[in-house]
């Protein structure tokens, strides 16, 4: 899928600067359908390509659901704008647990979200700040 080794941790790096965001405090994966609908409504005018908008929604959902399932609580998700990209940033309380793509797992068991996001993103990474882990991905919007 990517040029990275299958067991590679996402790169440790800060995201590029971006403008103010749509932000959500998340507590349960059951909230995600409503958040996806809000995200779609609020970003439709930012992208002229419906496929790019679909990729944004998919990447956001994968990142947010990973944080809710594995992040130890206190999940915040945001979508910010750069001149030509969407910046998705998701934080959780699992600061010592870097994002790791699933290795050696049957694809039917899931766990391919990080691979998918890395393929769609022009850049991606993670960093720790204030005791929280921040995972981010930059996706084109034009």
Q: Where do the model's predicted regions map?
A:
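Conserved short strand/loop->alpha-helix "switch" segment adjacent to the catalytic nucleotide/phosphoryl-transfer site
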Residues: 33-61
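Short, well-structured hydrophobic secondary-structure segments
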Residues: 59, 64-69
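Conserved long hydrophobic alpha-helices within structured protein cores
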Residues: 28, 33-37, 90
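Charge-dense, low-complexity intrinsically disordered segments
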Residues: 26-29, 50
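Conserved beta-strand-loop-beta-strand hairpin that lines the nucleotide-binding pocket
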Residues: 1-27, 68-142
């Amino acid at each position: 899928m990517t040029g990275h080794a299958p067991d590679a941790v996402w790169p440790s790096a800060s995201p590029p600067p971006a403008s103010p965001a749509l932000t959500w405090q998340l507590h349960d994966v059951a909230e995600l359908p409503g958040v996806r609908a809000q995200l779609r409504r609020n970003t439709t005018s930012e992208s002229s390509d419906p496929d790019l908008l679909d990729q944004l929604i998919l990447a956001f959902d994968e990142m947010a659901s990973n944080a809710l399932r594995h992040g130890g609580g206190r999940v915040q998700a945001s979508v910010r704008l750069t001149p030509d990209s969407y910046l998705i940033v998701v934080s959780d309380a699992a600061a010592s647990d870097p994002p790791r793509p699933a290795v050696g797992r049957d694809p039917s068991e899931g766990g391919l979200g990080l691979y998918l996001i890395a393929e769609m993103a022009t850049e991606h990474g993670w960093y720790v700040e204030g005791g929280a882990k921040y995972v981010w991905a930059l996706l084109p919007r034009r």
